[in-house]
């Protein structure tokens, strides 16, 4: 059926001349004989043709993307026959982003999916919202990994172990997963082996992180001048006799930022397949230091992952009979140990970053013994903190309220959060015939977590 196309774009190749078809599919454009017209329209293949008078152009449908196979929750189908709203992210897409976590990998790769970072901590979880906020109390989507619902997020997965991610965005997913799918469904399929020789891969990557910018703050001289001016304007005497003697003083941001914070990843996997067995084994380690406190071992994220995907074909008689002709069983096992150390984040009062922006640049990170002796009331406590060189950390004093020396804060042991997660999925597939398949599966999802904290003496 040949029908007019409204809004198709026509351009003269190599020039700025262009036109758009009207409601009847007609167009007119200034072009010379021998030039080439380029016609584009969404859903149709691009057409290039030589210029002629009274041309009649016909576009053909672009079926290339319609042949892609997508997971829909109850099997796999071609995009050309799927009516639900599905976005797909392939392993090649993930390889181009090198994400820390799987949920971070969806940023900018799936339409209708909003991914925002909850904080700047290393390995921090992201908020994933599919087509907006679903409910007041819980807007997180349902995660399905290899057909098994997973609780508590999917940060236990190594992004390199993933074959594809499908995002089910409309109400059709509710017919499969019920009310749990009210906020959308994210289907994750992990990798398997391919027939041929055994493949062993090792990947290593190392990168650096730096703060995007430093806040523009006063140096010590500018600070002293401003303080004197404020006191004079208030009718009081200035407190600094020679503001210019302080020089630049201390930029506390330079003191606490961990420039060139490292990001490291090791991954090794082995895969293969025969007529009977399909297997994929992997081991991965990831470590990321924080740009604040990472050099004090106070802010970092580590993840150790192990995975084993195995499928065994018990019998395959598809050539001999049409009913009950194939039986296969599969075992997917995964383990992850995640640990992270963090500092106070998004806190105006008392956090290392908040203190670094608030403290006077006249103060120094440490004090000499003579200075400490001269202020015995301030430095006479038995709980004083010292740096690695044995120098006493400066105490800002009572005028700074909850602000503390950020270097002293970072020198203390921090909180260490850790978790162990075991996920096992056992399945069996029987081909009944006539396109019907019977599948039975059993899964176990075990998580153990805890935290080691430290409270300093006062």
Specify the residue positions occupied by each region the protein language model found.
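Surface-exposed loop/interface segments of Gram-negative outer-membrane beta-barrel transport/assembly proteins
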Residues: 80, 194-249, 293-301, 305, ...
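Short, small/polar-rich motifs associated with maturation and membrane association
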Residues: 1-329, 423
């Amino acid at each position: 059926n040949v029908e007019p196309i409204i809004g198709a774009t026509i351009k003269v190749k190599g020039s700025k001349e262009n036109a758009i078809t009207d409601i009847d599919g007609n167009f007119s454009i200034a072009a010379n004989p021998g030039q080439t017209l380029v016609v584009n329209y969404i859903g149709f293949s691009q057409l290039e043709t030589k210029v002629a008078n009274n041309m009649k152009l016909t576009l053909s449908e672009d079926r290339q993307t319609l042949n892609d196979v997508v997971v829909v929750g109850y099997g796999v189908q071609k995009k050309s026959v799927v009516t639900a709203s599905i976005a797909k992210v392939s392993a090649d897409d993930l390889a181009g982003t090198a994400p820390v976590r799987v949920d971070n990998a969806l940023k900018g790769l799936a339409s209708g999916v909003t991914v925002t970072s909850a904080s700047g901590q290393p390995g921090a979880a992201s908020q994933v919202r599919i087509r907006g906020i679903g409910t007041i109390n819980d807007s997180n989507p349902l995660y399905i990994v290899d057909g098994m619902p997973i609780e508590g997020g999917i940060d236990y997965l190594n992004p390199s172990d993933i074959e594809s991610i499908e995002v089910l965005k409309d109400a059709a997913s509710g017919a499969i997963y019920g009310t749990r799918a009210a906020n959308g469904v994210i289907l994750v399929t992990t990798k398997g082996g391919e027939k041929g020789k055994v493949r062993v891969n090792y990947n290593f990557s190392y990168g650096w992180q730096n703060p995007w910018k430093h806040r523009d703050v006063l140096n010590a001289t500018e600070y002293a001048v401003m303080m004197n001016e404020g006191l004079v304007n208030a009718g009081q005497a200035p407190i600094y006799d020679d503001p210019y003697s302080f020089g630049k003083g201390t930029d506390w941001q330079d003191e606490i930022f961990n420039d060139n914070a490292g990001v490291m990843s090791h991954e090794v996997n082995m895969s293969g397949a025969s007529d009977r067995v399909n297997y994929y084994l992997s081991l991965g380690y990831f470590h990321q230091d924080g740009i604040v406190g990472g050099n004090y071992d106070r802010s970092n994220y580590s993840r150790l992952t192990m995975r084993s995907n195995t499928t065994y074909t018990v019998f395959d008689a598809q050539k001999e009979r049409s009913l009950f002709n194939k039986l296969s069983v599969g075992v997917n096992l995964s383990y992850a140990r995640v640990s992270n150390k963090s500092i106070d984040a998004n806190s105006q009062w008392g956090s290392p970053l908040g203190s670094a922006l608030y403290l006077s640049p006249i103060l120094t990170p440490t004090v000499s013994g003579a200075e400490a002796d001269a202020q015995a009331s301030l430095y006479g406590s038995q709980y004083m903190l010292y740096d690695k060189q044995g120098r006493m950390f400066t105490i800002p004093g009572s005028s700074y309220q909850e602000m503390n020396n950020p270097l002293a804060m970072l020198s203390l042991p921090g909180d260490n959060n850790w978790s162990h997660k075991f996920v096992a999925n056992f399945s069996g597939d029987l081909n009944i015939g006539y396109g019907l398949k019977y599948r039975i599966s059993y899964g176990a999802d075990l998580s153990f977590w805890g935290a080691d904290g430290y409270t300093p003496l006062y």
